[in-house]
Curated annotation (Swiss-Prot):
Disease implication from the record: Cardiomyopathy, dilated, 2G: A form of dilated cardiomyopathy, a disorder characterized by ventricular dilation and impaired systolic function, resulting in congestive heart failure and arrhythmia. Patients are at risk of premature death. CMD2G is an autosomal recessive form characterized by early-onset, severe cardiomyopathy that progresses rapidly to heart failure in the neonatal period without evidence of intervening hypertrophy.
Impact when changing residue 356 to A: Strongly impaired activity in promoting actin polymerization
UniProt keyword Phosphoprotein, yes or no: yes
Annotated stretches, region: Interaction with tropomyosin alpha: 1-47
Species classification: Eukaryota, Metazoa, Chordata, Craniata, Vertebrata
Compositionally biased intervals (Pro residues): 419-449
Annotated transmembrane regions: none
Coiled-coil stretches noted in the UniProt entry, renumbered to this chain: 16-41, 113-148
Protein name: Leiomodin-2
Chain intervals with Basic residues compositional bias: 477-487
Pfam families listed in its UniProt record: Tropomodulin
Biased composition (Polar residues): 149-160, 465-475
Oligomer and partners: Can bind at least three actin monomers and thereby provides a nucleus for actin filament formation. Interacts (via N-terminus) with tropomyosin alpha (TPM1) (via N-terminus). May also interact with TPM2 (via N-terminus). Interacts with FLII.
Annotated region described as Interaction with actin 2, given as residue ranges: 162-497
C-alpha cells in the first residue's frame, strides 16, 4: 500500500487491517491481486521481454491440447514425405543396423522385416533413428541411380544379392565431375558456376593445337585443382593458336602462378592473361612479372582482387620489372601507393605511344612501296613553292607593286610542275649581301628567288640576316613616321590601316608572346601597305614573265 503514499487523504486507510482483507479474499481474487501487483512492480531479475503481462493465455474450451496437436502434425508430415520418396523409387525396406553398415548390403539371406509403428508406441529416439535410416537409404539409391541409370530394387532385397559398396563409386563421381557416358544432365548441372567448359576436352584441344580454340576460359570453376591448372599451363607452352588464357576465381595459388610464368617465357602467341580473384601472393605475381622480361607478345595482364594484399614493396618491384617492357598496354591492378601508380601509368602511356608510332611507320612504308618514285617528285613539287612566301616580302617592304608580283608568281607556280615535271629555269644571280638593304631610302633588290634554290646555305645565317633586315626596316619606319605624323591629319589612310590589321597581329597585342619569324604572304603584303604611302609608290615595268 506504499504506492498510494503520494495521494491526499490517506488517513482513512490507516485504520484498515490488511491481514483481514487478504484472509477474506478467495483464491481467484488473490490471483488477480498478484497479477495487478506484478504489473505495478515487475520483478527486476526477469528480462524486459518477460516482465509484461501475458495476453495469450486462455482457458481451454474443451479437451484440446495444442502440444499434442503439433506433435501429431509433425509425425504425419514426416510420414507423408517418406511415402512420397518411397513412391518414386518403390518400396524400400527399413534397416535397423548401425550407422557404419548403412551403405553396405550384406550377403546374408536374412530378410528385412518391416515393422508398422502406431502413434502411441513411437518415441522420440526411435523417430530420430528412423529419419536417419530413411535419409541414408535415399542417398544410396540416388547415387546408384546416377551411376547405373536405374536400380533394380528386387535384386537389392533378394536373398542371394552380391555386396555393392557405393563409396568408391561416389568418389569416382566426384573425381570425374559427374561426367559419365550414361549421364544426361545438362552442363549447368555439372558445373553449378555456369561455365560450360569441359576440362578434359579443353586440355585435349590445347595439346592437339586445335585451330578453333583461340580462347581458354576456366573462370569460376571452383572444383578445379591446382594440378589441373598446372597441366593447362604446361600444355600451352607448345600451343600456337590460343590467344587468351583466363582463370579468374579458380582458387589458383602460387604454384599455378609459377607454371604460368614458365609458360609465358616460352609461349609467343598468348596476348591476354587473366588471373583475377585468386589466392596468388606477391611472390607469384613477381614471378609472372619477371617472365614478362622475356616475353614480347603479351599486351594485357589482369591480377586484381587477390586474397593476399600485395604491399608497397611488391608494387615498387612490379614497376621496376616493367620499366624495360615495351609491349604491355593494359594492366588490371589498382596500385595502393601513388608513386608506383603514376610510374605505371607513364610506362603504359609510353608503350601505347610506341605502338602508335610503329603503326604509322608501317603505313608510311606501305604507301612508299605503292607510290615509288612518284612520291619524290610530289614532295619536291610541294617543297619548292612553299618556302617562297615567307622570306621575299620582308626584304621588299617599300615597294608595294613588287609584292603582288610575288604573290602572283606564288599562285602561278604550282601549275608549272604539274604541267611540266622538270623544274623552272633558274633566275638571275642574287644581288650583293645586306649592305644595300640596310639603308631605307633605296629600294631593295629584286626578289631573292635564287636563295631559295640554294641547298648549302646555313639556317643560322639566314635567320640573322632576316632579323637584321627587320630591325633596319623598323628603325626606318619609326624615323619616317616621326617626321610625317605631324603633317598628316586623320585621313582615310589610317582607317584603311586599322581595317587591314590581321587576326594574328590582334592576338599578338593581347599576349606577350614574341612574333614568329615566318609569316604568310598576305600578312607581309598588308604590313607593307600599312607602312607605305602614296608618295613612295613608283611605276615599275611589268616583267617579261608576266606579259
Amino acid at each position: 500500500m506504499s504506492t498510494f503514499g503520494y495521494r491526499r487523504g490517506l488517513s482513512k486507510y490507516e485504520s484498515i487491517d490488511e491481514d483481514e482483507l487478504l484472509a477474506s479474499l478467495s483464491a481467484e481474487e488473490l490471483k488477480e491481486l498478484e497479477r495487478e501487483l506484478e504489473d505495478i512492480e515487475p520483478d527486476r531479475n526477469l528480462p524486459v521481454g518477460l516482465r509484461q503481462k501475458s495476453l495469450t493465455e486462455k482457458t481451454p474450451t474443451g479437451t484440446f491440447s495444442r502440444e499434442a496437436l503439433m506433435a501429431y502434425w509433425e509425425k504425419e508430415s514426416q510420414k507423408l514425405l517418406e511415402k512420397e520418396r518411397l513412391g518414386e523409387c518403390g518400396k524400400v525396406a527399413e534397416d535397423k543396423e548401425e550407422s557404419e553398415e548403412e551403405l553396405i548390403f550384406t550377403e546374408s539371406n536374412s530378410e528385412v522385416s518391416e515393422e508398422v509403428y502406431t502413434e502411441e508406441e513411437e518415441e522420440e529416439s526411435q523417430e530420430e533413428e528412423e529419419e536417419e535410416d530413411s535419409d541414408e537409404e535415399e542417398r544410396t539409391i540416388e547415387t546408384a541411380k546416377g551411376i547405373n541409370g536405374t536400380v533394380n530394387y528386387d535384386s537389392v532385397n533378394s536373398d542371394n544379392s552380391k555386396p555393392k559398396i557405393f563409396k568408391s563409386q561416389i568418389e569416382n563421381i566426384n573425381l570425374t565431375n559427374g561426367s559419365n557416358g550414361r549421364n544426361t544432365e545438362s552442363p549447368a548441372a555439372i558445373h553449378p558456376c555456369g561455365n560450360p567448359t569441359v576440362i578434359e576436352d579443353a586440355l585435349d584441344k590445347i595439346k592437339s593445337n586445335d585451330p578453333d580454340t583461340t580462347e581458354v576460359n576456366l573462370n569460376n570453376i571452383e572444383n578445379i585443382t591446382t594440378q589441373t591448372l598446372t597441366r593447362f599451363a604446361e600444355a600451352l607452352k607448345d600451343n600456337t593458336v590460343v590467344k587468351t588464357f583466363s582463370l579468374a576465381n579458380t582458387h589458383a595459388d602460387d604454384s599455378a602462378a609459377m607454371a604460368i610464368a614458365e609458360m609465358l617465357k616460352v609461349n609467343e602467341h598468348i596476348t591476354n592473361v587473366n588471373v583475377e580473384s585468386n589466392f596468388i601472393t606477391g611472390k607469384g605475381i613477381l614471378a609472372i612479372m619477371r617472365a614478362l622480361q622475356h616475353n614480347t607478345v603479351l599486351t594485357e595482364l589482369r591480377f586484381h582482387n587477390q586474397r593476399h594484399i600485395m604491399g608497397s614493396q611488391v608494387e615498387m618491384e612490379i614497376v621496376k620489372l616493367l620499366k624495360e617492357n615495351t609491349t604491355l598496354l593494359r594492366l588490371g591492378y589498382h596500385f595502393e601507393l601513388p608513386g608506383p601508380r603514376m610510374s605505371m601509368t607513364s610506362i603504359l602511356t609510353r608503350n601505347m605511344d610506341k605502338q602508335r608510332q610503329k603503326r604509322l611507320q608501317e603505313q608510311k612504308q606501305q604507301e612508299g612501296y605503292d607510290g615509288g618514285p612518284n612520291l619524290r617528285t610530289k614532295v619536291w613539287q610541294r617543297g619548292t613553292p612553299s618556302s617562297s612566301p615567307y622570306v621575299s616580302p620582308r626584304h621588299s617592304p617599300w615597294s608595294s607593286p613588287k609584292l603582288p608580283k610575288k604573290v602572283q608568281t606564288v599562285r602561278s607556280r604550282p601549275l608549272s610542275p604539274v604541267a611540266t615535271p622538270p623544274p623552272p629555269p633558274p633566275p638571275p644571280p642574287p644581288p650583293p649581301p645586306s649592305s644595300q638593304r640596310l639603308p631605307p631610302p633605296p629600294p631593295p633588290p629584286p626578289p631573292p628567288l635564287p636563295e631559295k634554290k640554294l641547298i648549302t646555305r646555313n639556317i643560322a645565317e639566314v635567320i640573322k640576316q632576316q632579323e637584321s633586315a627587320q630591325r633596319a626596316l623598323q628603325n626606318g619606319q619609326k624615323k619616317k613616321k616621326g617626321k610625317k605624323v605631324k603633317k598628316q591629319p586623320n585621313s582615310i589612310l589610317k582607317e584603311i590601316k586599322n581595317s587591314l590589321r590581321s587576326v594574328q597581329e590582334k592576338k599578338m597585342e593581347d599576349s606577350s608572346r614574341p612574333s614568329t619569324p615566318q609569316r604568310s604572304a598576305h600578312e607581309n603584303l598588308m604590313e607593307a601597305i600599312r607602312g607605305s604611302s602614296i608618295k613612295q609608290l613608283k611605276r615599275v615595268e611589268v616583267p617579261e614573265a608576266l606579259r
